[in-house]
UniProtKB/Swiss-Prot annotation:
Belongs to the methyltransferase superfamily. Archaeal-type CbiT family. It holds the Pfam family Methyltransf_31. One of its GO terms (biological process) is anaerobic cobalamin biosynthetic process. It comes from the Archaea. The gene is cbiT. It is an enzyme of class 2 (transferase). S-adenosyl-L-methionine binds at residues 24, 48-52, 72, 101. The keyword Transmembrane helix does not apply. This is Probable cobalt-precorrin-6B C(15)-methyltransferase (decarboxylating). GO terms for molecular function: cobalt-precorrin-6B C5-methyltransferase activity; protein methyltransferase activity. It comes from Pyrobaculum aerophilum (strain ATCC 51768 / DSM 7523 / JCM 9630 / CIP 104966 / NBRC 100827 / IM2).
Length: 196
């Protein structure tokens, strides 16, 4: 299956999933991908790829000649990402690696686009490494859910003097209940965009 549209936001249900493997939801994914300012034929590194939704959509957007390097420490996430890459026809330009991101990042080909989809307490070190590797003009986007991760990221970016933007995104999806439509909220997400 390939995605026939030129816009991001493939419906969540189109992706292969596995219990315990996180997925960036369609609406958040569309915003994060727009913040990355992807380039045709470009390269992206996706840290903490989970089900590979960001990786797959980035590979589709950047098209032929592009490369996406997806990293996750969870072997199941790596397996699911590979399956989603094959399902959407981007397996030839999406390389998936299992391991610790801080160890793998310096070994990958350089990129000026990084997506940090996890990181927890390592988020400041991931930002630092990505900023160093991205070089001038690089864009690093992270999505975080917890206030603790947000604080860690903002403290690092402020202390490092890095230009950044932040947006809190709150999405509610409509669903039918007893003949009525109600809105069911997704978790609020903070999208942080840092510029190297």
């Amino acid at each position: 299956m390939s995605w026939p549209y030129a816009t991001p936001g493939i419906p969540d249900e189109e992706f292969i999933r596995a219990e315990g493997v996180p997925m960036t939801k369609a609406e958040i994914r569309a915003l994060a991908l727009s913040k990355l300012r992807l380039i045709k034929g470009g390269t992206l590194v996706d840290v903490g790829c989970g089900t590979g939704t960001i990786s797959v959509e980035a590979a589709l957007i950047m098209g032929e000649g592009s490369k996406v390097y997806a990293i996750d420490k969870d072997p199941l996430a790596v397996e699911i990402t590979k399956k989603n890459a094959a399902k959407f026809g981007v397996g030839d330009r999406l390389i998936v690696a299992e391991g610790d991101a801080l160890e793998l990042l310096p070994k990958l080909p350089r990129s000026n686009r990084y997506f940090l989809g996890g990181g927890g307490r390592e988020l400041p070190m991931l930002f630092q490494t990505a900023l160093e590797l991205a070089g001038t003009g690089g864009v690093i986007v992270a999505d975080v859910i917890t206030l603790e991760s947000l604080r860690l990221a903002l403290d690092f970016l402020e202390n490092a003097g890095v230009k950044y933007e932040i947006a809190q995104v709150y999405i509610a999806r409509g669903r039918r209940l007893g003949g009525y439509t109600i809105l069911s909220p997704l978790n609020p997400v903070y999208i942080i965009t840092a510029y190297a």
